[in-house]
Design a protein with these regions (language model features):
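Outer membrane beta-barrel
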Residues: 44, 50, 56, 101-255, ...
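Outer-membrane beta-barrel "beta-signal"
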Residues: 394, 468-480
Length: 480
């Protein structure tokens, strides 16, 4: 009404000064709000943790299992059945030039732990500085049956491990240390002195170690990469919702390898450096036409630095297990010595091609698989070693409970197609090892899970004449 408008006009005139002051405060508040929205994030660090208990048993039912290698304590082969020696060196007989073969028929059950504490620090809200600490005391009993260069491989639960270079010692180590930031809306860069390669490559929904397959051999491609952690950078490009590309260069720097030994942790060793020791260059293309299907194609180039004239073991991929040397006449074992003579190699260069897929056919059933092929050239002798591997499996999500996952997988971790004579350990008697695994992830609640697992190992250490080995593991998993 007209009289109401006149009242409003009179009030505006009477309180003009107050309204002007209020308008100024609102404008100032809007400026401050815009500034806060632009710079809203203060440095924040969040702590998360994972703790595992492992109760593990490995048995051949008292049948002798052959393995290649010499005991770490240097005892003569005839006096060393393998008991108590968890890290073995590869050596050849001085007369025949053949790898030394020993036997063991039992391993004691173990109860161990592993813990990871992760600090995630962000400065802008979009970046992430990751510092992960680890400590554990696990030595899986299956290692008692393993040849040199096979430590923590077949039948060994991934979380049944020690974190540092001293097996069984609960030393605290830096597991991961890297910084990730967006270069654009579609490109992310990760850089650091200890980048975890497996955070960026070779993922599979049914073999992720926290909820899926659970052994060292089954959680990823056995041949894919010689570096677990390394110094360098990773670039990830989400080209489209259906296509992703990732590439990396990493110089080896792994928490469980002893830096005091020349040839390990080469990226921080001035004798080798970031580009002169063990390093890898990786490229992976992921095609995801739907949420149910993923196909990954990978290429990896590796330079493998020799240690004691041998290459292999923890930094041997794409030949995942065993130790290579220059052939008979090298790596000669003398009773009473901890180490064999020089293996005759300086380094090896290697190429790996791999394919990896997972397909959720329905809500309660899926299939997955991997295939890999590796070509290794030994220097300075200029000789070739070729190795292939495969994995095939079934996944049963939400079996008996929402969030649960049962996995059955069959795999061939290493089939030597060329160059057996250059294996100082790992080639066995010409056989090929196979593994069968069944595991079941059962979430008790949001923070606790039980994961029973069973592994059967056929032709262990690539000996056709070896008996089967069976592993039973019960994992209790805590997350916070």
């Amino acid at each position: 009404r007209k009289e109401d408008l006149e009242v409003v006009k009179r009030l505006q005139e009477e309180f003009a000064a107050e309204l002007a002051a209020l308008r100024g405060r609102v404008e100032a508040l809007e400026v401050r709000t815009a500034t806060l929205e632009k710079q809203q994030f203060s440095t924040t660090t969040k702590l998360s943790g994972l703790v595992w208990f492992n109760r593990s048993t490995a048995t051949s039912f008292d049948k002798n299992v052959q393995f290649e290698g010499i005991p770490f304590d240097g005892r003569t082969p005839s006096a060393a059945p393998g008991a108590g020696n968890f890290v073995r060196n590869a050596g050849r007989d001085a007369v025949t030039g053949r790898p030394i073969v020993l036997r063991v028929d039992e391993a004691q059950s173990t109860f161990s732990y592993l813990t990871w504490l992760t600090f995630n620090t962000s400065f802008t809200g979009r970046d992430n500085l990751v510092t992960q600490l680890a400590a554990g005391n696990g030595i899986s009993p299956i290692n008692e049956f393993a040849s040199a260069g096979f430590f923590n491989s077949f039948g060994s639960p991934f979380t049944d491990q020690s974190a540092g270079p001293q097996n069984g010692s609960p030393a605290v180590v830096i597991h991961d240390l890297f910084y990730s930031f967006p270069l654009s809306d579609k490109v992310t860069v990760t850089v650091g002195p200890r980048v975890n390669w497996y955070r960026h490559f070779d993922f599979n929904r049914y073999t992720f170690f926290l909820t899926g397959a659970s052994s060292f051999d089954s959680i990823g491609a056995t041949q894919s990469n010689a570096i677990d952690r390394g110094s360098g950078a990773v670039i990830e490009w989400n080209i489209s919702p259906k296509l992703r590309f990732a590439a990396a260069y990493l110089g080896e720097n792994t928490e469980f390898l002893p830096s005091a030994v020349p040839g390990f942790n080469t990226s921080s060793d001035p004798r080798f450096g970031l580009f002169g020791g063990t390093y890898t260059a990786t490229a992976e293309l992921t095609f995801s036409p739907s949420n149910a299907f993923n196909l990954r194609l990978m290429y990896n180039y590796s330079r493998l630095q020799a240690v004691g004239g041998q290459v292999g073991g923890a930094t041997g991929e794409p030949f995942p297990y065993g130790q290579l040397d220059a052939g008979p006449g090298f790596s000669v074992f003398t009773p009473g010595n901890n180490f064999p003579s020089d293996g005759g190699l300086q380094f090896a260069s290697a190429h790996f091609l791999g394919v990896n897929f997972d397909w959720a056919i329905s809500k309660g059933f899926g299939i997955f698989g991997r295939y890999g092929y590796g070509d290794v050239n030994l220097e300075p002798i200029d000789r070739k070693v070729n190795v292939q591997s495969f994995q095939a499996g079934l996944g049963f999500p939400d079996l008996f409970k929402k969030g649960a996952l049962a996995v059955v997988t069959f795999l061939m971790p290493m089939d030597i197609t060329r160059g057996r004579r250059f294996f100082a350990a790992g080639a066995g008697d010409g056989g090929t090892m196979y593994e069968l695994e069944a595991s079941y992830y059962f979430p008790v609640n949001d923070n606790i899970a039980l994961v029973p697992a069973f592994y059967a190992i056929f032709n262990a250490n690539n000996f056709d004449s070896n008996p089967n080995i069976y592993v039973f593991n019960m994992r209790t998993q805590f997350s916070f």
